[in-house]
């Protein structure tokens, strides 16, 4: 909980330094992604999946729901996430409640929040987008977190650097992600680079209201010595 308090206090302090033009009304967003493989922070979480997303935002504050369901195997990850976030200028801060169909609760109950028998993972994040470079830090602070080498809660963390650029009519992003210390959550025994990735996206429009981004990417995990090539597309409203 100390980590969460630090994130919230730091976010409030930084937010006070920004003056932004806020939106005048509540805005909504809907999207459905279809991916050939579910790759997250360098980890393989399943084969072909459908991933719906729904969100609302107002004056920098946002609430979103996101899910993932495997299409080819009953053993693939099923996931449902809720995220409360705030952004001002390039700064962002948020809290996410992840729920997976595997964890400490053998019955996979969603409304099971007991600290030692839940499938939920609670994560705080803070970051800044400089335009040419983005930095993001994530830390688990409650729920089904991993443990360190002493068997204690690891407060599993992940740090990511992203660099966007345009090339041959596509939007690209190069990403390097690392886990700073040992945790069973990411399968690391100390500091480890867990993702080196490159992704290309090209958008197509259907009428005036529907956008269809098509993307492909390569994600390598030097820690686990795995590499994944995936593709996907989304319908965005």
Regions found by a protein language model. Give the residues of each.
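Transmembrane beta-strand segments that form the barrel wall of outer-membrane beta-barrel proteins
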Residues: 30-38, 61-71, 93-101, 108, ...
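Residues that define the transmembrane beta-barrel architecture of outer-membrane proteins
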Residues: 26, 46-50, 76-80, 89, ...
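Outer-membrane beta-barrel initiation region
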Residues: 23-57
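Outer membrane beta-barrel transmembrane domains
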Residues: 171-206, 215
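Short loop/turn motifs that connect adjacent beta-strands in outer-membrane beta-barrel proteins
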Residues: 22-27, 94, 165-173, 201-214
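Outer-membrane beta-barrel "beta-signal"
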Residues: 198, 204, 225-237
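Detector for outer-membrane/organellar transmembrane beta-barrel domains
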Residues: 112-183
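Cleavable N-terminal export/targeting peptides
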Residues: 1-27
């Amino acid at each position: 909980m100390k980590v969460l308090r630090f994130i919230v206090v730091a976010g409030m302090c930084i937010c006070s330094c920004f003056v932004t033009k806020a939106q005048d009304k509540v805005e909504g967003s809907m999207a459905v992604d279809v991916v050939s493989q579910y790759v997250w922070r360098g980890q393989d979480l399943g084969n072909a999946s459908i991933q719906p997303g729904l969100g609302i935002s107002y004056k920098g504050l946002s609430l979103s729901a996101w899910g993932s369901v495997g299409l080819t195997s009953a053993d693939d990850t099923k996931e449902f996430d809720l995220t409360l976030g705030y952004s001002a200028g390039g700064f962002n801060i948020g809290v996410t409640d992840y729920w997976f169909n595997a964890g400490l609760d053998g019955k996979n109950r969603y409304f099971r929040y007991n600290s030692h028998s839940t499938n939920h993972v609670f994560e705080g994040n803070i970051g800044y987008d400089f335009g040419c470079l983005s930095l993001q830090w994530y830390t688990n602070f409650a729920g089904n977190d991993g443990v360190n080498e002493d068997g204690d809660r690891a407060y599993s963390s992940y740090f990511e650097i992203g660099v966007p650029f345009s090339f041959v009519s596509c939007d690209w992003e190069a990403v390097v992600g690392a886990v700073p210390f040992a945790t069973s959550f990411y399968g690391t025994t100390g500091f480890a680079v867990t993702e080196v990735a490159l992704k290309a996206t090209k958008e197509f429009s259907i009428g005036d209201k529907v956008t269809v981004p098509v993307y492909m990417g390569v994600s390598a995990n030097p820690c686990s010595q795995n590499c994944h090539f995936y593709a996907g597309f989304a319908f965005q409203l």
